[in-house]
Amino acid sequence: MKSHIFDENFPAFAMHTVRQKVASVVQIGQDWGENGWLDVEEILPQLHGSRATFHTLDAGLFKRRYCHGSYCIVYYDVLETELGKWVIKFLKHHNFRTQVQRLSKVIRISPTKLTYWELHAYAIRKTEWQ
């Protein structure tokens, strides 16, 4: 399985930007899985054991209960026209640059900060853009 899995609702122009800068990228319904897969019922079980980062626009996935030791979920709360830019910026952030740094987290990306849940932590954490 690839390292970066993008939800089917990521626009084509954002995927184009990401594919130019990031290796090991697939999009649900295009390169992997099927269109119409439900996030919780069908996508998340496929991520178990994958060590993948799942990128989504679905705010419903920004919940502590979705933290898992073998994958990461990143929810983008940014303008759709700027998605590609924010994916690249996130992957260059010093706290989330590597796969190991991202694992076990559910992260919300916004223009002002990164907010995240981490497995076995009971409080939400925040970090600023550098």
Short names for language-model regions:
Residues 2-17, 21-22, 27-30, 62-81, ...:
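Polar low-complexity intrinsically disordered regions
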Residues 1-4, 41-52, 129-130:
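Short, mixed-charge, low-aromatic patches
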